[in-house]
Amino acid sequence: MNAQLDNQGRLRHFLTTEGLPRPLLNQILDTAESFTGVIGKSVKKVPLLRGRTVINLFFEPSTRTRTTFELAATRLSADVLNIDVAVSSQSKGESLLDMLRNLEAMQCDAFVVRHGDSGTAEFIARHVRPGVSVLNAGDGRHAHPTQAMLDMFTIRQHKGDFEPLRVAIVGDILHSRVARSQIHALNGLGAGEVRVIAPRTLLPRDVETLGVRVFHDMQAGLRDVDVVMMLRLQRERMRGALLPSEGEYFKLYGLTEEKLSVAHPDAIIMHPGPINRGVEMNSAVADGPRSVILQQVTNGIAVRMALMSMLLGRAGGGEDA
């Protein structure tokens, strides 16, 4: 059984999109849909998690992810604590497990964890007491499942059924936890074809085992696609000369209107952020009519509300606070 699920097949933790059954993936998207109305109200709160406590443990910097997790929890009426790891007891030599035990003793209900090492969220999930949930906000190169689900939600809003879709993921696949989670989610939801487009130096050796078609040429890879998902070049994770220069990368793999002309006329453009303009795409594409990048940010709140409600409370957004 998937370690994220309880013995009745319900979410206990949310650590990865890999291996999740299609009905559960759709339930997450359906639940997120129920919260979109809440986000649009003047009073953006429901009382589902009143009395619950969520602790954000971010060992890596983040703007969008941390902010939307905090907004999601507060809009469900939970109490939120943000731990500044740089000045926490861990910076004084305390182990991760000891830190976890002390925070658990404060009777929290969930940890939202971002860490530079793959597997950290799963490690914490294995050691928390029963009744405490862990949400993975990104761990090393391994996974970023909530980003993937907000991407799936955005795609469904624009395209509906996943089965006829051709989706291209472009850029630094090798270092991207987002790409892995996107691929697992797209395949889990039955997308017609998932493509990855990147130079050989930015592809993992086992990429084809993930159920994707590999392209090294942008024009060939983008032909007739319905969704283009661009990725950030993760210079901070690169070791060695994987690229000749950012200018050369943009020439070959940066998204422009000219390169986009071979995609389906209604193709949407996505990016998990932050965007490096002039490297991954130009401003005409990023700010153009087919870009849904800011909608992805908005949808992050609804999707994270959905996941917290499924883990900690009653799913659905029908009540006012």
Curated annotation (Swiss-Prot):
It is an enzyme of class 2 (transferase). Gene3D superfamilies: Aspartate/ornithine carbamoyltransferase (3.40.50.1370). The keyword Transcription does not apply. PROSITE patterns: CARBAMOYLTRANSFERASE. Its EC number is 2.1.3.2. L-aspartate binds at K92, R177, R232. GO terms for biological process: 'de novo' pyrimidine nucleobase biosynthetic process; 'de novo' UMP biosynthetic process; amino acid metabolic process. Keywords: Pyrimidine biosynthesis, Transferase. One of its GO terms (molecular function) is amino acid binding. Pathway: Pyrimidine metabolism; UMP biosynthesis via de novo pathway; (S)-dihydroorotate from bicarbonate: step 2/3. It catalyses: carbamoyl phosphate + L-aspartate = N-carbamoyl-L-aspartate + phosphate + H(+). It comes from the Bacteria. InterPro entries: Asp/Orn_carbamoyltranf_P-bd (IPR006132), Asp/Orn_carbamoylTrfase (IPR006130), Asp/Orn_carbamoylTrfase_sf (IPR036901), Asp_carbamoyltransf (IPR002082), Asp_carbamoyltransf_Asp/Orn-bd (IPR006131). Carbamoyl phosphate binds at R64, T65, R114, H144, Q147, G273, P274. Catalyzes the condensation of carbamoyl phosphate and aspartate to form carbamoyl aspartate and inorganic phosphate, the committed step in the de novo pyrimidine nucleotide biosynthesis pathway. Heterododecamer (2C3:3R2) of six catalytic PyrB chains organized as two trimers (C3), and six regulatory PyrI chains organized as three dimers (R2). HAMAP family: Asp_carb_tr. Belongs to the aspartate/ornithine carbamoyltransferase superfamily. ATCase family. This is Aspartate carbamoyltransferase catalytic subunit. It comes from Alkalilimnicola ehrlichii (strain ATCC BAA-1101 / DSM 17681 / MLHE-1). The lineage of its organism: Bacteria, Pseudomonadati, Pseudomonadota, Gammaproteobacteria, Chromatiales. The gene is pyrB.
